[in-house]
Each structure stands twice: as structure tokens, then as C-alpha cells.
């Protein structure tokens, strides 16, 4: 565990999660600013969030895995894909990055366009229970897309994971904005809420819904649909950060990284 934390690759990965979440929040929230001359459309916001996540997954995915979302990180922990310590540092970096991204946007946005900085809120008389279920479903489909499109065990061509994930985020926003402003990402909701000091009684929805949805997707994918053939000791080693995969696994992982491009050969 200590060896993992002290490695340069680990530090780079944590920084990549911080930077990616900062950029994601800046562009995503920026697309939702209410300019007096032109109010944002649902399609505009959905495309901005989707393009941002696709771009960042393409650019920084090979460094950290491109989680950019505490719900996805926790789901991968439950799915036995990352260590507990890595999950902790990733989530911390994502939350700090989200605050930084929202803070920068707050600083550069004119007062008449800033509004509430796109803080997530319940819309159209949606109840907290309804909102939680919506966020759960939206994040469930996103997590399934991420797990399937980045699974190193798949031998058939899967196209571009970055493009697939970006489209999944766009899809979620096209539906979710009407209910909750669409979170699917606790960091996306937490950042502007901190900067604006605006935590509504329903803020928990944007944590519980996405996390439960992503964790359910991890259980379904990694334990029921496509379970790993790992022993109990190997699973414990992964959680502790002491697991050392064999050379064949590493070769498959490197080959998988080559598919993180916008076109396939």
C-alpha cells in the first residue's frame, strides 16, 4: 500500500483526477450560465457535459483511468478494480477539483450571467424520492457504459470508450435536466454548492442517487454478468493495493489503452 502511494504514477493519477474534474466542472457549469443575450438550451448543456467528459477521458484516461466522478470511483472500489487508498485519494482530488473549477468560473463569469452557478436543484415539482430514483437510473446507465467500454478482458473491438462515455453523459442530461438539473456526479453538485454556499435540503439526493446507481451497476457487471476469476486473497490484495498482476494481464492492459482513441483501426 505504501509503495503504491509513494509512486510517481500514483501521484500523477491523483493530479489527473483533480485536473480533469476541474476542467469538467468549469466547462459543464459554464455551458449553463444564463447570459442575458442568449439563455442556454437543454441540448447545449447536454452536449457540453458530454463533450467535456469525452475529451477528458481521451486526454487523461490513460493516466488515472479517467474516473472524474466519486460515484464511479466508489463503484470501481466495490467492483474490486482499485485499492481503497486510491479510491480515497481520487475522491478527495475530484471534490477539490470540482470546487476549484466552480470557483474559477465564479471568478470569471459576469455577475449578470453567473446566476446560481448551475447548482443542482429539484425542478418541475419533483420530490426528493423521485429525484433520487432518477439520479440512480441515470448514473446506472453511465456506469454500465464505462465498465463495458473500458473492460480490458474484452477481445472484440469496442470502438472508442471516450466517445461512448461522452454520449452516455449527454443522454443522461437530455433526460435528467428536467428533473434535477442532472448530476450523475456528486463532485459536479458539490463544487458549485460550496462556492455559492447553497446546500438545499435535497443536496443528499445528488450523492445517494449517483453512488447507489453506480454501485448497483458495479455489482451487476463485475459479479453477475462478467465476474472476475480472482481468488479471495487476490481480491483482498487489490483492496489493499498490494496486488501484482501477471505479465499477461499487464500486456492486456497496455493493449486496452491503445483503444482509447476516437477512431478504431
UniProtKB/Swiss-Prot annotation:
Keywords: Cell membrane, Cytoplasmic vesicle, Disease variant, Glycoprotein, Membrane, Palmoplantar keratoderma, Repeat, Transmembrane, Transmembrane helix, Transport. A motif (NPA 2) lies at residues 185-187. Glycans are attached at residues 124-125. Residues 1-12, 61-65, 75-87, 148-158, 225-265 are cytoplasmic. Detected in skin eccrine sweat glands, at the apical cell membrane and at intercellular canaliculi (at protein level). GO terms for biological process: camera-type eye morphogenesis; carbon dioxide transport; cellular hypotonic response; odontogenesis; pancreatic juice secretion; protein homotetramerization; saliva secretion; water transport. It holds the Pfam family MIP. One of its GO terms (cellular component) is microvillus. The chain crosses the membrane at residues 13-33, 40-60, 88-108, 127-147, 159-179, 204-224. CDD domains: MIP. It catalyses: H2O(in) = H2O(out). It comes from the Eukaryota. Residues 34-39, 109-126, 180, 192-203 are extracellular. It is found in: Apical cell membrane; Cell membrane; Cytoplasmic vesicle membrane. Changing residue 156 to A: No effect on localization to plasma membrane. Changing residue 156 to E: Increased localization to plasma membrane. Residues 66-74, 181-191 dip into the membrane without crossing it. GO terms for molecular function: identical protein binding; water channel activity. Gene3D superfamilies: Glycerol uptake facilitator protein. Changing residue 188 to C: In PPKB; no effect on localization to plasma membrane. Homotetramer; each monomer provides an independent water pore. Interacts with TRPV4; the interaction is probably indirect and regulates TRPV4 activation by hypotonicity. It is linked to Keratoderma, palmoplantar, Bothnian type: A dermatological disorder characterized by diffuse non-epidermolytic hyperkeratosis of the skin of palms and soles. PPKB is frequently complicated by fungal infections. Aquaporins contain two tandem repeats each containing three membrane-spanning domains and a pore-forming loop with the signature motif Asn-Pro-Ala (NPA). Belongs to the MIP/aquaporin (TC 1.A.8) family. This is Aquaporin-5. It comes from Homo sapiens. The lineage of its organism: Eukaryota, Metazoa, Chordata, Craniata, Vertebrata.
